[in-house]
Regions:
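Bacterial N-terminal signal peptides that target proteins for export
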Residues: 1-11
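Sequence context surrounding c-type heme c attachment/ligation sites in exported
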Residues: 5, 17-188
Length: 189
């Protein structure tokens, strides 16, 4: 009789574990998954492939070679990956050197309902997709628009972005994750 109750209890335990596994972050990942400054990427949850595998890429368009303090820049995060049915990203901009190393560098501003900006408990700003921004914009392509207001205090800034190309099975398995970073110095005064 005891065995009869043990099997259903074990099955319930497995069911509970399966429900606890995160399936998707369609409304944006938890803060701190850009791959920069010691952070993990989306690979922390989306497993099964290596980072930057299979010829896809993530890039941030609209970044200047040098930034002017206080200037507003229109940016586009672009994810190119085969078989993308839904996608997500996270981006941060921080000081990449000096006394402010790792501190937020400027302000991130969403320009539509496809992107939101979150301030983490650490004070760091993160831009990411919203639920409306999760569907891919074209076959094998996802894009998100935002603005960056450069900081008023000079110093090199580091932009880190990670993006996830989801395969549409509503699980964290076999999705493709890409990451990129760029450092931009301030313009000379």
């Amino acid at each position: 009789m005891r065995l009869r109750f043990t099997i259903p209890a074990a099955a319930l335990s497995l069911l509970g574990a399966a429900v606890a596994i995160p399936t998707v972050h369609a409304n944006g990942p938890p803060p701190g998954h850009t791959g920069g400054f010691g952070e993990p990427t989306c690979l922390e949850c989306h497993v099964g492939n290596d980072l930057n595998a299979f010829g896809g890429r993530v890039a941030v368009l609209g970044l200047p070679k040098t930034y002017e303090r206080g200037r507003r820049y229109s940016l586009t995060v672009v994810l190119e990956a085969e078989e993308t049915t839904s996608a997500g990203f996270q981006l941060s901009v921080r000081y990449g050197g000096g006394a402010q190393w790792g501190d937020p560098a400027g302000v991130l501003v969403p320009v539509d309902q496809r992107v939101s900006v979150t301030r983490a408990e650490t004070g760091q700003l993160y831009a990411n997709q919203t639920l409306q921004g999760s569907p891919s914009t074209d076959p094998d392509l996802a894009t998100w628009a935002l603005e960056w207001v450069a900081p008023s205090v000079g110093g090199p800034v580091a932009i880190h972005v990670a993006a996830n190309s989801a395969n549409g099975d509503d699980s964290p398995l076999s999705d493709l994750v890409y990451a990129a970073d760029v450092t931009i110095p301030p313009a000379r005064r």
